[in-house]
């Protein structure tokens, strides 16, 4: 149903094998991008509702999750679901000066004033190493590529992402928001 090989799906849907359901499968992307955009800032509170909409198909893990990250000045909402009718990889960013709607990897809408309305934007293509994690690993090992701290691929960023997802899992289990001091030092 979600387009994975049987081998990957069996891992993805088994918490003992470290598959974590939709929470970790899709939640990691939102946490990663938020951490990158906020330059490594950690959330003050993490809330999470993780549920099973299709328990017969995914009996051991969640398949529909909402994670809310509360920061000092903003809030990030991550919808991680295997239950949408079609493939979605979109993002909306709302700010005091307008919004950005990232429809997909190459189509964006921007609005800064209602009078001028929505403008379309095509972002620059990403580099080859950003498309291919094995290429990136090769460049780090053999070509001394430096990964910027808090960049999307950095250890710093991904440690924060792991902590966010751990807190989200615990928040869902306890059915209550968890404060930063539960996991971030």
Over which residues does each language-model region extend?
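Phosphate/oxyanion-binding loops and surfaces in catalytic or ligand/nucleic-acid-binding neighborhoods
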Residues: 37-41, 96-100, 140, 168-172
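NAD(P)-dinucleotide binding in Rossmann-like oxidoreductases
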Residues: 50-51, 55-65, 71-136, 151
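A generic structural signal for residues located within well-ordered alpha-helices
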Residues: 26-29, 129-132, 156-160
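Active-site rim elements
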Residues: 20-22, 122-124, 147-155
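Hydrophobic alpha-helical segments typical of transmembrane helices
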Residues: 30-33, 133-137
């Amino acid at each position: 149903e979600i387009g994975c090989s049987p081998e990957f799906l069996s891992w993805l849907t088994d918490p003992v094998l470290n598959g974590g359901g939709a929470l970790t499968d899709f939640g990691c992307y939102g946490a990663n991008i938020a951490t990158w955009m906020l330059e490594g800032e950690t959330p003050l509170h993490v809330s999470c509702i993780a549920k099973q909409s299709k328990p017969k198909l995914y009996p051991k893990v969640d398949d529909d999750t909402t994670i809310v990250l509360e920061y000092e000045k903003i809030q990030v909402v991550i919808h991680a679901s295997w239950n949408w009718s079609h493939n979605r990889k979109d993002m909306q960013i709302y700010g005091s000066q307008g919004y950005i709607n990232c429809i997909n990897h190459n189509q964006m809408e921007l609005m800064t004033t209602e009078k001028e309305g929505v403008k379309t934007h095509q972002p620059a293509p990403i580099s080859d190493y950003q498309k291919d994690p094995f290429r990136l690993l090769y460049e780090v090992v053999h070509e001394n590529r430096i990964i910027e701290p808090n960049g999307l691929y950095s250890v710093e960023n991904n440690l924060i992402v792991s902590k966010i997802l751990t807190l989200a899992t615990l928040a869902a289990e306890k059915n209550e928001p968890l404060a930063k001091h539960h996991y971030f030092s």
